[in-house]
Amino acid sequence: MRYNTFERLFSHERMDRYRQACGGDSRKAMTLYRYNLLLSQQIFTIISCFEVILRNAIDAKLVSTLGNEWLKDAVMPRGRFCTPATQKDFNSISRSYNNLMTEGQYTHTKLLASMDFGFWKYLFSPTQFRLTGSVLLGVFPNKERSTPEMQYNHSYIFNELDKINTMRNRIAHHEPICFFLQDSVISTTHVLNEYQKIQRLFLWMDVDSRALLYGLDHVQELCNKINELKPI
């Protein structure tokens, strides 16, 4: 495809950043755009796998401590999320629960699946972590031990999940992940850092990510191709 057509389809404003990053080379700009799409697909797939595994691990832990219907029970009268501090979670759960009940489709599993990444992240924030019994660090059996210099506590996990969620949302909103911050400079440093965070959390969860993502994970290869497009 000619660059003029490519630019018309995706907009001058969007493509100008790619062309600047490639030193004005329009052919390389189109290649960079395509590589960014492929990298976004890869990262989103890995985050999706991570989200499902995290969700299931959290559920298994809370079923064992709070009961088989812990999520629904949290928004029943006098439920643990019936507090002003957890109003957003209460609303999310209640909305999904009511919709499923109206459709005659309610199951605990379907209610779990209706919660977004942000919900699972916030279970590690101080209030939700305490209200669910302060047990959720147990989903990371291989977590590093805290030291006086570094506390690998629920706040640490929350912050790591927040960064992963931010990356997920960037991709979902079609924002590029192949640049340095907001500049028109090719860089895969940030996306590789977030990728390593996910790999580390998989390790802490006792998940063999290499076997899990066999045939799916080509992140480093794509990052290398992207970096080769940097102007000399």
Features from the language model and the residues they span:
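Amphipathic alpha-helical interface elements
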Residues: M1-I232
